[in-house]
């Protein structure tokens, strides 16, 4: 079991702490590709810890949203299109999404 430091921006950090968001999503590269079920995520500034209870890889953000509880991935998005175009693509390009695919990490506070 490994521990990974994680930086999550607001409002998503608050959504996680309030249990409104149970999936953290990233491109499937670097440390996110290495993470495994039972590993620990630790918020960088607050030191709260979360256990990874599932990890799923999808071809793109839309497929991820179609297969997971939409409200538990991006609680403040109005639709899948809104989440993809106004949230995900602020962080990642469609080219990187296609190259690396997407990982959805289900977490539980410990």
Residues of each region from the PLM?
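Glycine- and charge-enriched low-complexity intrinsically disordered segments
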Residues: 70-110
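Short, solvent-exposed secondary-structure boundary/capping segments
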Residues: 56-71
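Short beta-strand-centered aromatic/proline hotspots
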Residues: 48-58
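Compositionally biased, charged N-terminal/linker segments
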Residues: 1-35
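Catalytic phosphate/metal-binding cores of nucleic-acid and nucleotide-processing enzymes, i.e., regions
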Residues: 14, 27, 31-32, 49-51, ...
